[in-house]
Amino acid sequence: MIMKLMRTVSVAVTGGTGQIAYSFLFALAHGDVFGSDCSIDLRVYDLPGLERALSGVRMELDDCAYPLLQSLRVTTSLEDACDGIDAAFLIGAAPRGPGMERSDLLKRNGEIFSLQGSVLNVCAKRDAKIFVVGNPVNTNCWIAMNKAPKLNRRNFHSMLRLDQNRMHTMLAHRAEVPLDEVTNVVVWGNHSAKQVPDFTQALISGKPAVEVISDRDWLENIMFPSIQNRGSAVIEARGKSSAGSAARALAEAARSIFLPKDGEWFSSGVCSDYNPYGIPDDLIFGFPCRMLPSGDYEIVPGLPWDAFIKNKIQISLDEISQEKASVSLL
């Protein structure tokens, strides 16, 4: 019997004892991100003091007997977790507590992601791909990117896939079509209540969504704010933030990059340098992207903005710019 040689990727996951990581780790080890022909050298990191919880995560991963999980270590050393990695999933972040202003949250997480970026700069492979999940995600990603100048700025991504998935589902349900009939779902800007779920680009059964769903009032005043505020709605209903859906979205976001489908559009917060839409450089901004044969991505060019979308994009841009200014001295 001839054994097929597998490639191996070294992967770090932070916030390893949290809810999102708990769901994501099993998808990762199963092959949902890198495919069934790729073995994984997995490092799961969380803060000192969480060793016992990390050991429980390790037990469960071991007990799953995943064939693709070549090696596994749990650690409270960020340097150990990031040593020689090909990819990092930065999930851990400080949550917003009672009475905490957004500026306080930005400062606290700014310190966390400054450290993580600095460690990645020293320890990760130069071509490592970095996926940031911890909120406020665009600004956290920007901080990490700027603290890791030895890494390619184009390899930093902040997650907008959950917003894309939410919009995808709402459009499909409204049009009463299967999910795979909805394509070109685009989310611009910041992952916040000022994100821009752009229904004007979406297609339903190959036709513009605005033709299939002719009720513009529903698109602008029901669907649009529903996507913007979905995270808060989940917290209000469940008592906890999105976890399973966020983990699923993270796996899909990474898979779109590592195992792309021809012509697939995906929304991602990426470095805005030299973008085709006039967004200022040196931001992490949500754009529609697609993968190229070279393994790099491009921002999908030439998409028109109507007056409604253009105004909403400016609002989101203003928010990201203000967040950047508030942490730029970290």
Swiss-Prot record:
SUPFAM superfamilies: LDH C-terminal domain-like, NAD(P)-binding Rossmann-fold domains
EC identifiers of the protein: 1.1.1.37
GO terms of molecular function: L-malate dehydrogenase (NAD+) activity
Residues noted as binding NAD(+) in the record, renumbered to the chain: 15-21, 109, 116, 133-135
Binding site for substrate: 96, 102, 135, 166
Catalytic EC class: oxidoreductase
Catalytic residues in the record: 191
Entry superkingdom: Bacteria
Keyword presence, Mitochondrion: no
Keywords assigned: NAD, Oxidoreductase, Tricarboxylic acid cycle
Record field: catalytic activity: (S)-malate + NAD(+) = oxaloacetate + NADH + H(+)
Gene Ontology BP annotations: malate metabolic process; tricarboxylic acid cycle
Entry keyword NAD: yes
Pfam families hit by this protein: Ldh_1_C (PF02866), Ldh_1_N (PF00056)
Family designation: Belongs to the LDH/MDH superfamily. MDH type 2 family.
Protein purpose: Catalyzes the reversible oxidation of malate to oxaloacetate.
Protein's name in the database: Malate dehydrogenase
Provenance organism: Chlamydia caviae (strain ATCC VR-813 / DSM 19441 / 03DC25 / GPIC) (Chlamydophila caviae)
Chain's gene name: mdh
